[in-house]
Amino acid sequence: MNNCSYPKFRITEENPCEAVRVNVYGTRLVADAAVKYGVEKFVMISTDKAVNPTNIMGCSKRLAEIYVQSLSLAIIKGEVQGCTKFITTRFGNVLGSNGSVIPRFREQINNGGPVTVTHPEIIRYFMTIPEACRLVLEAGTMGNGGEIFVFDMGQPVKIADLARRMIELSGMKVGKDIEIEYTGLRPGEKLYEELLSHKENTKETLHEKIRIADVREYNYQDVTKCINLLSNFSLNVEIVDMVRKMKSFVPEFKSQNSEFEKLDKL
């Protein structure tokens, strides 16, 4: 089970080289070790931010998805010696996890406010920790190797409504006892997240909350060359060249409200 990554887009947008070293090259090291030592199944935890990424974190997780899937297909085709089955799970925010909005809102309410929301229209998908764990384990059990499993996250939640509801449940009134302050979208932040790109379709599984994304297949050797190049760029802190390469390999990566937007115009 691989859940090691820098998951916060704010940190990775400011430290893109670390994002590539940990999220991309780190995943490759762990995946290669799994093959070397004959691990039966390798389950990678991905994110909805990997879909049509608008920030470094999302693109780095998409590259990690691409690597493990290409490695799995290379094993199936006999191009790489091994028996490990690689399975990817992709889902959104987990309620109550470190850095999630609910603990932050609770702290802000306890301190008398204001409760900060980046944009009045921003929406996110949520699931509970037990539900996320259960679906990851079930996807890992049903996977045969090379799949990207997408979870049914239910209806998206408007973050402003969540903030308002938490304030009311605390016995206070918005605008009277406590304010909601809109701070503006941060670099790389989307108004809404997607679980699938417009180029992906899904296939049903026997589980009503789990589907398989039908994604483009990448050649393992091409992916390996790309990751080697990205790793060298990151070690030498050649940020512009590194991000440019990320955008060329994942062409749907379009930066938003970020210093890297200029690379989309070249």
Give the residues covered by each predicted segment.
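NAD(P)H-binding glycine-rich loop region in Rossmannoid oxidoreductase-like domains
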Residues: 1-21
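SDR active-site strand-loop-helix element
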Residues: 2-4, 42-47, 89-91
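Active-site helix of classical SDR
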Residues: 60
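Helix N-cap/beta-alpha junction loops of NAD(P)-dependent oxidoreductase domains
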Residues: 8-10, 48, 53
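Strand-loop microenvironment adjacent to phosphate/nucleotide-handling motifs in alpha/beta enzyme folds
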Residues: 36, 66, 70-266
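A short, exposed helix-loop element centered on a Lys and neighboring polar residues
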Residues: 31-32
